[in-house]
Curated annotation (Swiss-Prot):
Region called Mn 3, residue ranges: 237-260
GO cellular component terms given for this protein: cytoplasm; microtubule
Any one GO biological process: lysosome localization
Region (Mn 2): 112-135
Name this protein carries in UniProt: Microtubule-associated protein 6 homolog
InterPro entries linked to this entry: MAP6
Subcellular location: Cytoplasm, Cytoskeleton
Region entry Disordered, spans: 36-111, 203-378
Ranges annotated as biased composition (Basic residues): 322-337
Region: Mn 1, residue numbers: 79-99
One GO molecular-function entry: calmodulin binding
Function, as annotated: Involved in microtubule stabilization in many cell types, including neuronal cells. Specifically has microtubule cold stabilizing activity. Involved in dendrite morphogenesis and maintenance by regulating lysosomal trafficking.
Length: 378
């Protein structure tokens, strides 16, 4: 339905109005039920055709407060001029915005939430800060060298014999050998001894005479077998506690080749699946003793060229042997000629008879060929 049922005249007639009940089929539209219950009211007077409605009239129920309190004359209300224009004063609608009922607390909120309190990071100690190792205080008897004296020693190195330098260099790897494996044992007494040893070695290195800068340094391109040997020759200490040294007593590992699990078959593999074996399509292939294919070809050739079959009929061979000449008389020669002519005529008659007899045979053969072709097509 184009109109809602509530606004139809048939539904509105229940209110006991004074409308004509014969006009029920016409969908009468009402804006208020009071128009039906109070009775028919006269329609509002419309303005002239020249005036254009820019504002609602006084009789309009939706005009709001403008119609009641407007003091302009009717001519000004119906005019289209700019000076007579007056904006509509619409009543403001009640806002649906909820009230702000939040009341901030006087005490400040805690920055650290309960989650942060429960899930704190673990108290992981610093690396190298072991509480079971007692920290050694520096001894007061150590001579403190001034910075100027250090610089002078760096620039002017004391001349020492080469034998003493070699002895100092030889002592270094021995001490390293002694302190290398002890770091792996977790006993506190051994760890304390390791710390003491390292401190002594560092003190020795600080007071050791440095080599002059003129000596050639071992680089990577010199082709030294091990970098550790080159460092030992130079006599420079490393920052690592345990310098890498390759193991000497370990035998080289022999590569073991695992046997392949796959064993290839000794016999020749037949590349034919079960599907190929079952679905070969042997009916289409001609067998050795089967002459069906040849016969079909012959039938097709006969169907296309049926004149070739008649040519296959053997013709009687005519003997054209010349008789021997006899010098006795002319009579036997004439007799021989007559015999040849008679034999030629007889052969012609036989050929005509054979051609007459072959015609019905050809018809029968052509019928058979047509039947076979029809069967082959089916």
């Amino acid at each position: 339905m184009a109109w809602p049922c509530v606004t139809r005249a048939c539904c509105i007639a229940r209110f006991g109005n004074l409308q004509d009940k014969g006009d029920i089929a016409v969908p009468l539209m009402y804006s208020k039920y009071s128009e039906v219950t109070d009775g028919a009211q006269p329609p509002p007077p419309r303005p002239g055709s020249a005036a254009i409605e820019t504002q609602p009239s006084l009789s309009d129920p939706y005009s709001g407060s403008l119609g009641r309190f407007s003091k302009k004359p009717e001519s000004a209300r119906g005019s289209v001029m700019r000076q007579d224009y007056q904006a509509w004063k619409a009543n403001p609608e009640p806002s649906c915005k909820p009230r702000i009922e939040y009341q901030p607390s006087e005490a400040p909120l805690e920055r650290e939430t309960q989650y942060k309190k429960d899930f704190r990071s673990w108290p992981i100690p610093r690396q190298g800060d072991h509480p079971w190792i007692p920290k050694l205080s520096p001894s007061p008897t150590m001579p403190v060298i001034a910075s100027d004296d250090k610089r002078k020693k760096d620039f002017v190195a004391p001349k020492a014999p080469p034998a003493e330098i070699k002895l100092i260099n030889a002592e270094q790897p021995e001490s390293a050998k002694g302190r290398g494996p002890t770091a792996f044992i977790a006993a506190p007494e051994i760890l304390i001894s390791v710390v003491q040893e390292t401190n002594e070695i560092q003190k020795r290195e600080s007071f050791m005479p440095k080599l002059p800068a003129k000596e050639p340094r071992a680089t990577r391109d010199t082709g030294s077998p091990h970098p550790a040997q080159a460092r030992g020759e130079r006599g420079a200490g490393t920052s690592y506690r345990n310098e890498f040294r390759p193991w000497t007593d370990v035998k080289p590992v022999k590569p073991i080749k695992a046997k392949s699990q796959y064993q290839p078959p000794e016999e020749k593999v037949v590349h034919e699946t079960s599907y190929k074996a079952t679905f070969k399509g042997e009916s289409n292939q001609p067998a050795a003793g089967d002459n069906k294919l040849m016969e079909r070809r012959r039938i097709r050739s006969l169907y296309s060229e049926p004149s070739k079959e008649s040519s296959k009929v053997e013709k009687p061979s005519v003997q054209t042997s010349k008789p021997k000449k006899t010098s006795t008389s002319h009579k036997p020669v004439k007799k021989a000629k007559e015999k040849i002519m008679a034999s030629g005529r007889a052969s012609k008659k036989k050929g005509a008879e054979s051609s007459s007899t072959t015609k019905p045979e050809e018809k029968e053969k052509s019928k058979e060929i047509n039947n076979k072709l029809a069967e082959a097509k089916e």
